[in-house]
Amino acid sequence: MDSRVSGTTSNGETKPVCPGLEKAAEDGALQREQWSNKMEFLLSVAGEIIGLGNVWRFPYLCYKNGGGAFFIPYLIFLFTCGIPVFLLETALGQYTSQGGITAWRKICPIFEGIGYASQMIVTLLNIYYIIVLAWALFYLFSSFTIDLPWGSCRHDWNTERCVEFQRTNGSLNATAENATSPVIEFWERRVLKISEGIQHLGALRWELALCLLLAWVVCYFCIWKGVKSTGKVVYFTATFPYLMLVVLLIRGVTLPGAAQGIQFYLYPNLTRLWDPQVWMDAGTQIFFSFAICLGCLTALGSYNKYHNNCYRDSIALCFLNSGTSFVAGFAIFSILGFMSQEQGVPISEVAESGPGLAFIAYPRAVVMLPFSPLWACCFFFMVVLLGLDSQFVCVESLVTALVDMYPRVFRKKNRREVLILGVSVTSFLVGLVMLTEGGMYVFQLFDYYAASGMCLLFVAIFESFCVAWAYGAGRFYDNIEDMIGYRPWPLIKYCWLFLTPAVCTATFLFSLIKYTPLTYNKKYKYPWWGDALGWLLALSSMVCIPAWSCYKLSTLKGSFRERVRQLLCPAKDLPQGHREGPSAPATPRTSLLILTELEPHH
C-alpha cells in the first residue's frame, strides 16, 4: 500500500505523488518541479561532478602517486565508496523527493544533522569555489590580445628578476639565481598582487571583484527559474567543455615531447602502493570528484520522476566521471611533456596541481605554442565552463534544501528567485575578502579545511551508517527496487553495511594522524590563529551531526529508548511500495529500530 497520493497521467497510468503537493496547492504554494526529461538530469549531474578537479587534480595525483599503479587504490575506492555513496544519495533524493536536509529527516530524524553538515560544506564551497572562476575570467579577458601578457617581462608589474625562458640550443638562456618567470610574476604581481601574509589583507582587487560579480550574475540566471532554467543551460555548459578537452587533447598529443609527458603520467611504480598517503589521495579524490556528501546529488535526484532508473544513471555517471579524469590526464601531460622538452628541464619541475596548473604551468606552455592567444582562450573558456556548472549546481543544492525546509515561505511566486538572489549577494560579499591582496591566503584556508577530504569522509561515515543500520539496508534496497523494478547489485548493500564505513573511517583517522598545518607555496607558514580559523571551518560542518542528534534527544519526552525509537522511525508519508502481483520475500531488517522494539510498549 502506497501512502503517497496517487496521480494519473494523460495515458491513465497512476504514479506516486508526494502528499505535500496537494497540501501545498491548498496553501497556495507552487508545486515541486521535475526534470523535463532524463537528459537534463544526466547533464546536470555530469556538469556538477565533472569539474576542475578532473583537469587539474587527478592527472597530477596519478603522476605523483606511481602513475598507472595509482589506479589500483583509485578503483578500490571507486567501487567501495564512490559508486555506493553516489547511488545512496541519488536514490535518497529520488525516493523522498526532498532536498539535502529534509531527505534525511524523512528517513531517520535523528540523523538530520547529516543534511545540515552537507549544506554547511556547500555554503562554504559556494563562497570560495567561484573565486577560481573570477581568476579564469580575468585570464580569459587577458587572452584577447596579440601577445599574451604573461609571455614577456616588458610590463609594469615585472621585476628585475624576471627572465623570459626560451629554448636556446637545448638550454635556457638564463640561469640567474632567484630568477622568476613572467608567468609567475603575472599571476602573483598582476592578478593577485599578493601580500606578505594573511595578516596583511591589503586593498581589494577591483578588476577581480568585477570578474566575480560577472560570475555570480551568470550563475544566478542559470538557476533563477529552478530546474526549468538549469535543465536548459546544462545542454551547453556540460557538453562544450568536452569539445574543448578534445581539441586540447588533439593539439597536445601532436606536440614534440608529448610521449614523454604521457609516460610520466602512466608509468607504473608499484612500490608507491606501500605508501599510505597514496591511498589517502585516492580516497579524497573520489570524494572531491564525485561531489558526494555535499547534498547536490540528493537535490538533483529529488527532481526525478519516481520510477527513473537511478541505479543505471549512477553507474553510468560514475564511469563517465572517472573516464573524463583519465582522458584529461593525456591532454594535460602531453602539454607538460612538450613544455619539459622545450625548456630542457625535468617534467617534475613543470608538473603542478590545482591553481598552479591552471594559472602557471598551462599558461606557460601556451606561450610556446603557435597562435598562443587562441589556445589560451580555449583553455580558460573550458575552465570557466567546468567551474560554472559545478558552482550553480551547488547553489541549487543549497536553495533546494532551504525551499524544502520552508515550502510555505519559499515555494510561492518569485520567492525562490529572491532566495537565490539573497544567497548570491551574500556569497559575493563574503567572497570579496578572497580578492584582496591577501585574499589568496584566505582562499587556501577555505580550500584546505572547509571542504576538505576530512569533512567529506566524516559525513560519508554517518551517511552509510544511517542508511545501512539505522534505516536498514534491506529496506532501502526494497525502496530502490520499488522505483526501478529490480534490485541493484548485492555488493553495493554490503558496501553500505561494512566496506564503505570501514574504509572511510580508516582514511579519516589516517588523515588526522598525518595532518600537517597549511603552508602557502611551500614557504609561507600560517600564524596559529590562521590554523585555528581553518579548524573552525572544518568543525562547523562536522559538529552538526552529533549536535543535532543531542538537540533532538533533549527536546523529546519519555525514556531514552523511547526517544531514540521515535527518532529512528521514518516519516509515514514515504512510499511503501507499488508492485503488483505476488510480493517478493520479505527482506531481513537490519535496522537499529529492532533493538528499541525489544522494550514492551503499553
Swiss-Prot record:
<keyword id="KW-1003">Cell membrane</keyword>
<feature type="glycosylation site" description="N-linked (GlcNAc...) asparagine">
    <location>
        <position position="269"/>
    </location>
</feature>
<feature type="topological domain" description="Cytoplasmic">
    <location>
        <begin position="549"/>
        <end position="602"/>
    </location>
</feature>
<dbReference type="Pfam" id="PF00209">
    <property type="entry name" value="SNF"/>
</dbReference>
<feature type="modified residue" description="Phosphothreonine">
    <location>
        <position position="587"/>
    </location>
</feature>
<feature type="transmembrane region" description="Helical; Name=5">
    <location>
        <begin position="233"/>
        <end position="253"/>
    </location>
</feature>
<keyword id="KW-0769">Symport</keyword>
<keyword id="KW-0325">Glycoprotein</keyword>
<feature type="topological domain" description="Extracellular">
    <location>
        <begin position="142"/>
        <end position="206"/>
    </location>
</feature>
<dbReference type="GO" id="GO:0005332">
    <property type="term" value="F:gamma-aminobutyric acid:sodium:chloride symporter activity"/>
</dbReference>
<dbReference type="GO" id="GO:0006865">
    <property type="term" value="P:amino acid transport"/>
</dbReference>
<feature type="transmembrane region" description="Helical; Name=1">
    <location>
        <begin position="41"/>
        <end position="61"/>
    </location>
</feature>
<feature type="transmembrane region" description="Helical; Name=9">
    <location>
        <begin position="418"/>
        <end position="438"/>
    </location>
</feature>
<keyword id="KW-0813">Transport</keyword>
<feature type="modified residue" description="Phosphoserine">
    <location>
        <position position="591"/>
    </location>
</feature>
<dbReference type="InterPro" id="IPR000175">
    <property type="entry name" value="Na/ntran_symport"/>
</dbReference>
<feature type="topological domain" description="Cytoplasmic">
    <location>
        <begin position="1"/>
        <end position="40"/>
    </location>
</feature>
<comment type="function">
    <text>Mediates sodium- and chloride-dependent transport of gamma-aminobutyric acid (GABA). Can also mediate transport of beta-alanine, taurine and hypotaurine.</text>
</comment>
<feature type="transmembrane region" description="Helical; Name=7">
    <location>
        <begin position="319"/>
        <end position="339"/>
    </location>
</feature>
<feature type="transmembrane region" description="Helical; Name=6">
    <location>
        <begin position="282"/>
        <end position="302"/>
    </location>
</feature>
<feature type="transmembrane region" description="Helical; Name=12">
    <location>
        <begin position="528"/>
        <end position="548"/>
    </location>
</feature>
<keyword id="KW-1133">Transmembrane helix</keyword>
<feature type="transmembrane region" description="Helical; Name=3">
    <location>
        <begin position="121"/>
        <end position="141"/>
    </location>
</feature>
<keyword id="KW-0812">Transmembrane</keyword>
<keyword id="KW-0597">Phosphoprotein</keyword>
<dbReference type="InterPro" id="IPR002981">
    <property type="entry name" value="Na/ntran_symport_GABA_GAT2"/>
</dbReference>
<dbReference type="GO" id="GO:0042995">
    <property type="term" value="C:cell projection"/>
</dbReference>
<keyword id="KW-1015">Disulfide bond</keyword>
<keyword id="KW-0472">Membrane</keyword>
<keyword id="KW-0532">Neurotransmitter transport</keyword>
<feature type="glycosylation site" description="N-linked (GlcNAc...) asparagine">
    <location>
        <position position="169"/>
    </location>
</feature>
<feature type="transmembrane region" description="Helical; Name=4">
    <location>
        <begin position="207"/>
        <end position="227"/>
    </location>
</feature>
<feature type="transmembrane region" description="Helical; Name=11">
    <location>
        <begin position="490"/>
        <end position="510"/>
    </location>
</feature>
<dbReference type="GO" id="GO:0016323">
    <property type="term" value="C:basolateral plasma membrane"/>
</dbReference>
<feature type="transmembrane region" description="Helical; Name=10">
    <location>
        <begin position="453"/>
        <end position="473"/>
    </location>
</feature>
<dbReference type="GO" id="GO:0035725">
    <property type="term" value="P:sodium ion transmembrane transport"/>
</dbReference>
<feature type="disulfide bond">
    <location>
        <begin position="153"/>
        <end position="162"/>
    </location>
</feature>
<dbReference type="GO" id="GO:0005886">
    <property type="term" value="C:plasma membrane"/>
</dbReference>
<feature type="transmembrane region" description="Helical; Name=8">
    <location>
        <begin position="366"/>
        <end position="386"/>
    </location>
</feature>
<comment type="similarity">
    <text>Belongs to the sodium:neurotransmitter symporter (SNF) (TC 2.A.22) family. SLC6A13 subfamily.</text>
</comment>
<feature type="glycosylation site" description="N-linked (GlcNAc...) asparagine">
    <location>
        <position position="173"/>
    </location>
</feature>
<protein>
    <recommendedName>
        <fullName>Sodium- and chloride-dependent GABA transporter 2</fullName>
    </recommendedName>
</protein>
